[in-house]
Curated annotation (Swiss-Prot):
Full protein name: Haloacid dehalogenase-like hydrolase domain-containing protein 2
Matches recorded under SUPFAM superfamilies: HAD-like
Gene name per UniProt: HDHD2
Coiled-coil intervals, chain numbering: 47-71
Matches recorded under PANTHER family: 4-NITROPHENYLPHOSPHATASE-RELATED (PTHR19288), HALOACID DEHALOGENASE-LIKE HYDROLASE DOMAIN-CONTAINING PROTEIN 2 (PTHR19288:SF46)
Cofactor remark from the record: Binds 1 Mg(2+) ion per subunit.
Family membership noted in the UniProt record: Belongs to the HAD-like hydrolase superfamily.
One GO CC annotation: cytoplasm
Keywords per UniProt: Coiled coil, Magnesium, Metal-binding
Length: 259
């Protein structure tokens, strides 16, 4: 891992780290205020594909988090950027609530497949339509490949198993744009003036949050909330820089040891 420099930026995951659906992680709002009172730059990074950035922001505001839209970098944004770069017409396999983030993108007569978490659309007919497009040479763009995520009623399948099914059936590989891709973390830092070696990532997903960030040159703090399961910290190499109980504990560590 690269030589450490003074901490300048903290990237924070949202779902599972600051909140679970419409409930905040206890103490998270106050911890965020304490972090903001320091000199570090705070940005929020999320793989959520269940809602648009605007809907997500409204949810966070209702939970009394002091967060602005320009501080959030989502995998939906990364997917839209790639679609525009490739100049393709995507079949959008995403939740209807995420569609506003693709406003203005041409989707008729699709020649690409973009897939996120879309429980209402993950049925045979729709997946078979995507399968046929891919067989005809359409690129497969995965917003992310998370295995599962945390809901109020327990763990639930993420888009990863469905992306993998399409890859398997068509003998192709998806281009993944969200966490844990290195480019996602670097894009999140773009315009901040901060380098990965000056950054800490806090999240509840050992692979996508912590492993991805550490592969990009950051330090990763794994929190035991959200989708965390016992011994997750042993699933990645190198191990997390730190594993702690929750976001407030992560902030305590940063304030006491990294500033």
């Amino acid at each position: 891992m690269a030589t450490r420099r003074a901490l300048k930026a903290v990237l924070v995951d949202l779902s599972g780290t600051l909140h679970i659906e419409d409930a905040a992680v206890p103490g998270a709002q106050e911890a965020l205020k304490r972090l903001r009172a320091t000199s570090v730059m705070v940005r929020f990074v999320t793989n959520t594909t269940k809602e648009s950035k605007q809907d997500l922001l409204e949810r966070l505001k209702k939970l009394e988090f002091d967060i602005s839209e320009d501080e959030i970098f989502t995998s939906l944004t990364a997917a839209r950027n790639l679609v525009e770069q490739k100049q393709v017409r995507p079949m959008l396999l995403v939740d209807d609530r995420a569609l506003p983030d693709f406003k203005g993108i041409q989707t008729s007569d699709p020649n690409a497949v973009v897939i996120g978490l879309a429980p209402e659309h993950f049925h045979y007919q729709i997946l078979n339509q995507a399968f046929r497009l891919l067989l005809d040479g359409a690129p497969l763009i995965a917003i992310h490949k998370a295995r599962y995520y945390k809901r109020k009623d327990g763990l639930a399948l993420g888009p990863g198993p469905f992306v993998t099914a399409l890859e398997y059936a068509t003998d192709t590989k998806a281009t993944v744009v969200g966490k844990p891709e290195k480019t996602f973390f670097l894009e999140a830092l773009r315009g901040t003036g901060c380098e990965p070696e000056e950054t800490v990532m806090i999240g509840d997903d050992c692979r996508d949050d912590v492993g991805g960030a550490q592969n990009a040159g950051m330090r990763g703090i794994l929190v035991k909330t959200g989708k965390y399961r016992a011994a997750d910290e042993d699933k990645i190499n190198p191990a997390p820089y730190l594993t702690c109980e929750s976001f407030p504990h992560a902030v305590d560590h940063i304030l006491q040891h990294l500033l």
